[in-house]
């Protein structure tokens, strides 16, 4: 029996009605403690228990992409470990990679609370966090102390500081990249969060090109750089970004961030505010984004004949959800909201399910499943 799903989650969500952000903060405190006391005998014992319970090791799940070895294709999406305080623990929870951030050059508190809401009827979350983080310099100091101690690839998601005007966005991203470029295995240009005023306008080809240009000129170490896009973009805008990915030799595209659309939601009223989701600002993640993000993955694969790697994220709860994104063209996938709802067993359940899918389709490795929809 999945204790989290049938006992812990109902207790926290329904009986205690714990505030989602408070619950996240307590979780991060615990994970941070485990991460930073990993040399203690007691902590090693806990990590061994976690690894035996949550980690799946199988060579069929391994991939080598953009110079990095991924032990499995399931990663932690940005937004959970904003400041990299638990970077060393994610491998013990079964993840094949983890993306830290979003981090900005200037430390910022984010938007005023309440700013994180569960929509259980929709298996979704609504957030308007606003890139709350301690800043790139603090993250750099923390990661420098732990350099070489990570057993999985660690990505860093970069955002624009709220105080920085849009016309100075390129320099803002560059300043963060300069501090962190030797400390992350890959980097993500986040221009798709709906919670920083004007940020999504940076997805425009002319604005985005100025950011990518300065980053790649600084990128002497040839670190893989991705751009993360919104699910609300029109096909023409996505095609423009694909063109930029080719021009600036990006490692790939992450599809997708949260949506600002509210159609089709079952939730009528958000309990914390007494308002309908349509009246609340922020982006929605989870199941409502699932189909659209997969459509965009499919579009990118078709437009590029699979030449640009895709990290698929949005509404992944089950092995079937993961398989759909991989066969549509995603080389890797990321989870966040699904992990909150399904609990820590979810990663191992997805990986076990993916192995079953490989056997069902008589495939030797997960890489053979990428874009399987389009292979005869």
UniProtKB/Swiss-Prot annotation:
Keyword Flavoprotein: yes
EC number(s) from the headed UniProt entry: 1.3.5.2
UniProt-listed Pfam families: DHO_dh
Binding site for FMN: 78-82, 102, 157, 190, 228, 256, 286, 315, 336-337
Catalytic residues identified in the record: 193
GO biological process, alphabetically ordered: 'de novo' pyrimidine nucleobase biosynthetic process; 'de novo' UMP biosynthetic process
UniProt GO cellular component terms: cytoplasm; plasma membrane
Keywords carried by this UniProt record: Cell membrane, Flavoprotein, FMN, Membrane, Oxidoreductase, Pyrimidine biosynthesis
Binding site for substrate: 82, 127-131, 190, 195, 257-258
Enzyme class: oxidoreductase
Known pathway: Pyrimidine metabolism; UMP biosynthesis via de novo pathway; orotate from (S)-dihydroorotate (quinone route): step 1/1
Membrane topology designation: Peripheral membrane protein
Cofactor note: Binds 1 FMN per subunit.
Alphabetical list of InterPro entries matching this protein: Aldolase_TIM, DHO_dehydrogenase, Dihydroorotate_DH_2, Dihydroorotate_DH_cat, Dihydroorotate_DH_CS
Catalysed transformations (reactions): (S)-dihydroorotate + a quinone = orotate + a quinol
Similarity field: Belongs to the dihydroorotate dehydrogenase family. Type 2 subfamily.
Described purpose of this protein according to its UniProt entry: Catalyzes the conversion of dihydroorotate to orotate with quinone as electron acceptor.
Description of how the protein assembles with itself and partners: Monomer.
This protein's name: Dihydroorotate dehydrogenase (quinone)
The encoding gene: pyrD
């Amino acid at each position: 029996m999945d204790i989290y799903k049938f006992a812990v989650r109902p207790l926290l969500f329904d009986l205690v009605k714990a505030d989602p952000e408070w619950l996240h903060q307590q979780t991060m405190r615990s994970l941070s403690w485990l991460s930073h006391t990993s040399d203690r005998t007691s902590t090693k014992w806990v990590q061994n228990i976690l690894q035996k319970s949550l980690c799946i090791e199988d060579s069929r799940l391994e991939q080598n992409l953009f110079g990095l070895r991924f032990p499995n294709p399931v990663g932690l999406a940005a937004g959970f470990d904003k400041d990299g305080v638990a970077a060393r623990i994610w491998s013990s929870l079964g993840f094949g990679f983890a993306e830290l951030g979003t981090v900005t050059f200037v430390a910022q508190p984010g938007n005023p609370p309440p700013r994180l809401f569960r929509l259980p009827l929709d298996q979704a979350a609504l957030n308007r966090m606003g890139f709350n983080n301690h800043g790139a310099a603090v993250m750099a100091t923390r990661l420098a102390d732990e350099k070489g101690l990570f057993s999985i690839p660690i990505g860093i998601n970069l955002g624009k500081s709220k105080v920085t005007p849009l016309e100075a966005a390129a320099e803002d991203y560059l300043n963060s990249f300069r501090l962190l470029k030797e400390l992350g295995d890959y980097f993500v240009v986040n221009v798709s969060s709906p919670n920083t005023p004007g940020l999504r306008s940076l997805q425009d080809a002319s604005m985005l090109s100025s950011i990518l240009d300065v980053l790649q000129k600084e990128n002497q170490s040839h670190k893989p750089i991705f751009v993360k896009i919104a699910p609300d973009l029109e096909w023409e805008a996505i095609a423009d970004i694909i063109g930029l990915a080719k021009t600036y030799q990006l490692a790939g595209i992450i599809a997708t961030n949260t949506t600002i659309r509210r159609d089709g939601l079952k939730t009528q009223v958000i309990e914390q505010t007494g308002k309908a989701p349509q009246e609340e600002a922020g982006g929605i993640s989870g199941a409502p984004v699932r189909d659209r993000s997969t459509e965009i993955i499919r579009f990118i694969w078709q437009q590029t004949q699979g030449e640009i790697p895709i990290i698929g994220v949005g509404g992944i709860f089950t092995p079937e959800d993961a398989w759909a994104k991989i066969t549509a063209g995603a080389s890797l996938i990321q989870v966040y909201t699904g992990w909150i709802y399904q609990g820590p067993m979810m990663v191992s359940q997805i990986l076990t399910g993916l192995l079953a899918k490989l056997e069902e389709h008589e495939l030797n490795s997960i890489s053979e499943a990428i874009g399987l929809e389009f292979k005869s």
